[in-house]
Design a protein with these regions (language model features):
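Carbohydrate-active catalytic/glycan-binding domains of CAZyme proteins
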Residues: 1-306
């Protein structure tokens, strides 16, 4: 009963919006990219190809409560994403479009935890056309999946929703494979390898620096996606994983959360959550909540009749 009441309150007062932020590495001020008022945009990944920057992100329709994946070209002069197209839309929620280069081809691993899969897609016409080529892991509620290519192995980092007391933000698990395309992924023996809410959940692609690899994570201890952490990987083997905090980035002024970070060349990209202080948003949420309740009642009635 408590969970039901909590869910109603969360939906009724969901007066926030995720926005995409961007800046050059030598600058300190994050700039918010233009976007419609009726959507949230989050989980941005950026790719530099043939002299252009492309941004991949989750777009969440606030009224329909549905997330799908989009791609577009970053226009530096006009402060927005141009030529936006939906590249993946399913009946289930999609987010965190992890786009990466592997053996001179571009691939994407989105979050599809609602579908209980970790799927691999390949770009057949970058950046707008993809095809699913493989399910990496089945029957798994996994969030924010990223890969580390090291020592001729592929490590898949994820956070698994195991049961009601083990949320995505409370664990970090690792799977490993000898080949992304031609081998299966298997769990390392000591999963979950970490269970600290402040550091475990992924927040972007791995970053390779002069001193090694850094895992981007988000702090979910204070609130979901509060800040960004850079975790230096000290050891990773078939049986061991060790990391330490290298750096933290807090939300810019005016934002209450900051939970994805990626970089391409000298362009850094992130997302920030703002609070919408608007009575009409609250009224719209109340109407949408009533519609959702009546829809569930109607579906339940039909199922009983069957």
């Amino acid at each position: 009963m408590f969970n039901i009441i909590k869910k109603i309150i969360e939906n009724l007062f969901k007066t926030h919006q995720w926005c995409i932020l961007i800046k050059k590495s030598n600058e300190s001020v994050w700039v918010r990219l233009k976007q419609p008022k009726d959507v949230s945009r989050a989980d941005p990944f950026i790719v530099y190809k043939d002299g252009k920057y492309y941004i991949f992100f989750e777009e969440f329709d606030i009224k329909k409560r549905h997330g799908y994946l989009c791609a577009g070209e970053y226009c530096q002069n006009c402060n927005e994403i141009k030529n936006i197209r939906v590249i993946l839309n399913e009946k289930y929620h999609l987010s965190f479009p992890n786009v990466f280069l592997y053996k001179n081809e571009y691939y994407m691993i989105p979050e599809s935890s609602e579908n209980k899969t970790i799927d691999l897609y390949k770009f057949i016409n970058f950046p707008y056309s993809i095809v699913k080529i493989k399910t990496l892991v089945n029957d798994i509620g996994a969030a924010d999946n990223v890969l580390l290519f090291k020592d001729q192995k592929v490590y898949l980092f994820t956070s698994i929703y195991a049961h009601s007391r083990c949320l995505h933000s409370e664990n970090l698990s690792i799977y490993q494979s000898n080949d992304l395309l031609n081998d299966d992924f298997v769990e390392v023996h000591n999963n979950p390898v970490l269970t600290d809410k402040e550091f475990v959940r992924n927040g972007g692609r791995f970053i390779e620096g002069e001193s090694g690899f850094f895992r981007v994570s988000q702090d979910c201890k204070k609130r979901y996606g509060y800040k960004i952490n850079f975790m230096k990987v000290n050891k990773i083997t078939d049986t061991e994983y060790e990391e330490e905090v290298s750096k933290m980035i807090y939300p810019p002024k005016g934002y209450i959360a900051f939970h994805t970070y990626n970089i391409a060349n000298d362009i850094e990209i992130a997302d920030g959550k703002i609070v919408l202080k608007n009575l009409f948003v609250l009224i719209d949420n109340f109407i949408d909540l009533l519609k959702l309740i009546f829809k569930k009642i109607r579906i339940g009635f039909v199922n009983r009749q069957i």
